[in-house]
Amino acid sequence: MNIEAALARAQASQGIIPEWAAEEITKKAEVRYMPKTEVDAENEFVRHRLVSRLNVWKRSLENGAEEYLHYGATTVDIFDTVLVLQIKASLGILIDDLIEIENLLLKLTKDNIETYMAGRTIGQHALPITFGKKTSTWLAENRRNIERLKAVEEKINRSVILKGAVGTYLGLGSKGIETELLMSQELGLGTPYIADWHGVRDVFAEYALTLALISKSFGRIGDELTLLQMTEIGETLENLGFKAIGSSTMPHKKNPRGPGNLVNFSRIIPRQSEIILDDMVNSFERDQPRSDETLKDISITAELMTDTAIRLLNELEVNKDVMRKNLNITNGLILSQRVTYFLADIIGKDTAESMIHDIAMKAITENISLSDAIKNLSLIHI
């Protein structure tokens, strides 16, 4: 209704319809003039999602204003613009959520800039890092995701459409382009793309693919925190409260819920995006298949994902003592590279690497520390 009213005002300013008609349409652009029961009854007769609504709305318009409602537009003009406004609202929520997540990650990173832990590659202890270093990668990725959403938002803001069934402005005539611009401004959107996109869905596909990419960022965080909360590691904890139940049969369980949900979202959203991507393939100027419902679904799922991430980061506990303890599990072997490069300046890199490798393997075999193995160089054939 707001779109039809914006269209009427834009047309009135161009002299396409009378000013009084635009005022009447705007005045009656309220849901109470389109009761659902009447719309449902009308739809049983006309079998058209928009015409049924327009017919009911027209009953409330006076002095012949109904003749100018939906003047020169087509159904997809209205519903595609509705979709644009919905996605714009969704983007606003998502960007706000990512900014909140950015602030939470920034605090988490600052608080743990000196929280030492084992850096792991391919599931093995590799080199020492800090937990703040780990979360700084989440922070940087989240910032890039904010910029990605803002870039998509600019394109969505230009995607209002009033070009008619085949993109020629035939219903509006020579004033079509200017009327479309004025309607877009009335709706708080940007300068519309000149090219018709009823059958060109790349902007919506980019929106969906951006959400898919963002879901993988959160999936990575969820997977990491699931692993770090393992009984054998225990370096982080999603603190759901003392009374929280992890299992109906195992009282000791503290299952990570938020992390698992993030991983699940990272699987669902990319599958949804594939449907929207497929919708780019259209026959002629416009085809029948539409992914509008999937666009709504993916937007709702994305908002559930960011809400989950916010709750998780607010509830996250970092077990610094456990991280320090786990750092020493290898009895100092995690520092073998540092020792290698210290010796490299004395005996050469290749010789040092060969020597420390043999020492490290000896330490593992005999279950002694790296420092003890180095002290006992007589055990190693150099």
Model-assigned labels for residue ranges:
Residues L50, T135, G176, V200, ...:
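Active-site-proximal structural scaffolding
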Residues I3, L7-A10, L94, L98-I101, ...:
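Amphipathic alpha-helices that form helix-helix packing interfaces
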Residues N145, W197-Q288:
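Glycine-rich anion/phosphate-binding loop at the beta-strand->alpha-helix junction
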Residues L61-A65, K150-N157, M230-G234, P270-E274, ...:
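Proline-centered turn/helix-capping motifs that create local helix->coil transitions or kinks
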